[in-house]
C-alpha cells in the first residue's frame, strides 16, 4: 500500500502542475504555444485546448474543465457573465488586433473626395470602433463623450459628406473595390490577405478601442491570485512574448503589456 500511496500523491503533485487553457486557434493558441517553455521553466505544463466558437471556452472554464481562457475582450466577457450568470474575471490584457482604414478606389485619406464612400462593419461593436477611428483621423466629428457605443447618429460634423456604407464585418475587404475606403477588423484583414502595414491608418495602442478591446486572460472568480494564474500571466507578459507577437504578426496583432 505504501508505494501506491506515494505514487498517487506524486501524481496529484504533477496533476496540479498542468495549466489547461482554452483559446481561439489564431493568434491566441499560437501565443500560448510560444509561452510553453517559460512555464516549463517554472515547473508547469501548459495544455492548450482550441475552440472555434466564443461560447464553449467560457462554459468550460465555468465548469472547471479549464484553468483559464484567452480569446475574448472585456465587453464580450461582461455581457457573457450578465447573460449566463457566470462568474469569470479578467486577469491580464495581452494584445489587441487593430482596425485599419484600407484604400479602395481612393488612396489618399488627406484629400478625401466629397461624398466618399467608406465601408464599415454593420454590427454595433465593430461599427463603433470604425467610427472612432474615422474620428481619430479627423474625417468626421462625433458627439462629445462618444465611446464604444457610437453609431452613425452620433456624427455631428461630416465636412466631406462621407457616405458610411454598412457591410457585414467579414465582407468589408471584398467591398473595397466598390467604395473609396474600408475600415477592416484585424482578423478579417489577415484572413483576406490585406497587410496591416498597408493600412492608411490604424488604431493607436493608447486609443479607447485598443484598451477596450484588448484580448484578455480570463479565470474563475476567486482564482485571480492562484499560483497557476500568476505563472500563466507572467509567462504571457515577457519581453520574449512581446517580440514573438511583433515578429510573427507584423502589426496585425499588437502586444498591449
Task: Briefly describe each language-model feature range.
Residues 48-59, 147-174:
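Short helix-initiation/N-cap motifs at beta->coil->alpha
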Residues 91-140, 242-243:
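A conserved helix-loop-strand patch within extracytoplasmic ligand-binding domains
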Residues 125-149, 230-257:
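Ligand-binding clefts/hinges and TM-proximal coupling segments of bilobed small-molecule sensing domains
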Residues 79-91, 106, 178, 183, ...:
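Ligand-binding "clamshell"
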Amino acid at each position: 500500500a505504501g508505494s501506491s500511496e506515494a505514487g498517487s500523491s506524486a501524481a496529484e503533485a504533477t496533476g496540479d502542475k498542468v495549466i489547461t487553457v482554452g483559446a481561439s486557434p489564431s493568434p491566441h493558441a499560437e501565443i500560448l504555444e510560444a509561452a510553453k517553455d517559460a512555464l516549463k521553466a517554472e515547473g508547469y505544463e501548459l495544455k492548450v485546448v482550441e475552440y472555434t466558437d466564443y461560447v464553449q471556452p467560457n462554459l468550460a472554464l465555468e465548469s472547471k474543465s479549464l484553468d483559464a481562457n484567452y480569446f475574448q475582450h472585456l465587453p464580450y466577457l461582461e455581457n457573457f457573465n450578465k447573460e449566463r450568470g457566470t462568474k469569470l474575471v479578467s486577469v491580464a490584457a495581452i494584445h489587441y488586433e487593430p482596425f485599419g482604414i484600407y484604400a479602395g478606389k481612393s488612396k489618399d485619406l488627406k484629400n478625401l473626395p466629397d461624398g466618399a464612400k467608406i465601408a464599415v462593419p454593420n454590427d454595433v461593436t465593430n461599427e463603433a470602433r470604425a467610427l472612432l477611428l474615422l474620428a481619430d483621423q479627423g474625417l468626421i466629428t462625433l458627439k462629445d463623450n462618444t465611446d464604444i457605443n457610437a453609431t452613425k447618429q452620433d456624427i455631428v460634423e461630416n465636412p466631406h459628406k462621407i457616405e458610411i456604407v454598412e457591410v457585414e464585418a467579414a465582407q468589408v475587404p471584398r467591398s473595397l473595390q466598390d467604395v473609396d475606403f474600408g475600415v477592416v477588423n484585424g482578423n478579417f484583414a489577415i484572413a483576406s490577405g490585406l497587410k496591416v502595414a498597408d493600412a492608411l491608418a490604424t488604431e493607436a495602442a493608447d486609443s479607447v478601442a485598443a484598451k477596450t478591446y484588448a484580448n484578455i486572460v480570463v479565470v474563475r472568480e476567486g482564482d485571480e491570485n492562484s499560483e497557476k494564474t500568476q505563472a500563466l500571466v507572467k509567462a504571457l507578459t515577457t519581453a520574449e512574448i512581446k517580440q514573438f507577437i511583433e515578429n510573427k504578426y507584423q502589426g496585425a496583432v499588437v502586444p498591449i503589456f
